[in-house]
UniProtKB/Swiss-Prot annotation:
Its EC number is 2.5.1.7. The keyword Cytoplasm applies. Pfam families: EPSP_synthase. One of its GO terms (cellular component) is cytoplasm. Phosphoenolpyruvate binds at residues 24-25. It catalyses: phosphoenolpyruvate + UDP-N-acetyl-alpha-D-glucosamine = UDP-N-acetyl-3-O-(1-carboxyvinyl)-alpha-D-glucosamine + phosphate. This is UDP-N-acetylglucosamine 1-carboxyvinyltransferase 2. The active site is at residue 118. It comes from Staphylococcus epidermidis (strain ATCC 35984 / DSM 28319 / BCRC 17069 / CCUG 31568 / BM 3577 / RP62A). It is an enzyme of class 2 (transferase). Pathway: Cell wall biogenesis; peptidoglycan biosynthesis. The gene is murA2.
Amino acid sequence: MAQEVIKIRGGQALKGEVEISGAKNSAVAIIPATLLAQGQVKLEGLPQISDVETLVSLLEDLNIEARLNGKQLEVDTTQIENAPLPNNKVESLRASYYMMGAMLGRFKKCVIGLPGGCPLGPRPIDQHIKGFKALGAEIDESSNTSMKLVAKELRGAHIFLDMVSVGATINIMLAAVHAKGQTVIDNAAKEPEVVDVANFLMSMGADIRGAGTTSIKINGVEELKGSEYQIIPDRIEAGSYMCMAAAMGEEVILHNIVPKHVEALTVKLQELGVDIEIEDEKIIIRKQTPYKNVDIKTLVYPGFATDLQQPITPLLFMTEGPSFVTDTIYPARFKHVEELQRMGANIKSDEGTAVIKPSTLNGAEVYASDLRAGACLITAGLIAEGVTTIFNVKHIYRGYTNIVEHLKALGADIWTETV
C-alpha cells in the first residue's frame, strides 16, 4: 500500500524564522472541555495537526456544531447529545481519554473506546480511573474495546495521585467542575498545559485554584458558559525546533514562544555550548560546534521534558565525549536508538538510559515509532551525510504543524514522496 515518506538531504544550514504553533497538549484537552459549556466557545491559536481534526470529529459525533478554520475553532453545544464514541477514532490518539472526564462531567455517564496514541511502553490510565471513582463514578471495563462510566451524582473528593500525571490531573479537573462541593487534587501535575486548561475552564466560569502547584482545588459550579480563549504556544514544538537550530542553524529565530516554558532545555543547550539569545516572546539560536558532552535526566515540569529527550539526542553526536540520557518518566522511550544505529550512530540504551558517543551520521531508511522519535530522526537527517528516508510519518504529523514546509523555508533540503 502506498504511503508518504519524508526525505532529507543533510548538511544544509538553516536560516530564517519560524512561528511556533499553539500547544498540542493543551489543545487536545481544551477541545474535549468545550463540551462542558452551555452555548458557544471560540478557540484561537490551535495547532494545525491531525489530533485536532480527530477530536473535532468526536465532538460532531455528540451532535455538537463545530467549525474548524485553520487555527480557529468555533463550537456550539446547544444541540449536544450523549452518544457512545466509536473505537476507530478514539484508538488513533491517546488524548481521546479527555472525552471521558468531559462527558462524565457533562452527562454523568459515557461509553468510550479505549485510547490509543504513541506506543511508549506502559502508560496506564489507572490514576484517571481512581479519580473518577473517588468522584462517585462506577466503571465497567468488561469490554476489550470500550469503557463505560456512570455516576448517580458526582461529589467532590480529596484525591491524591500516586504518580504525577498531566493526563490524570486534567481529566479529574474536567470531571470535577460540576461535582457537588470541593475536589482537591494533591500531587497534581504543574505543567503549563494544566494551567492552560484550568484557565480555559475558569474563562467559562469554573472555580479552580492552585493550577500550576501540586495542590489544585475545584469548587463545583452548576453551569459553565461559553467563552473565547487563546491557547498557549507549544513548548515541545519550540524545543524541537531549538534542537534542529542548534544542530544546523546559522541563525534561526523562533516566534510565539514562552521562554520560561523551555527553560530546562535552554539551560542544557547552553551547557552544550549553543549560542542562544532570549527575548520576551522569541528565541534566537546559532550553532556553535563542537559541543561539550552533557548528561540529561528527564523529570516532571519544570524539569527536562521527556518529550524533548529524543529531539535533543542527535546533538549529542556532535560533542567531544560521551553523554548520558536517562528517562525517568517513560523508561521505554528509546525506540529511536535502533533507527539512529542504522544511520551509523554510536548509541546504546539499557533500562531507561542511553549512552551516546560522538558519531558521524549517514543517511538511511528509518522508521518513526512515535511522534518525538520522528522529530529526533528529522534532526538526525538534517545533520547526516546523504539522504535519509523517514517512514511512518503519520506520527510526525500528529504533533508538528507543517514541519516539512517550515524546514524548507529555513533552507533544509527536505521533501515528501509517496512510495
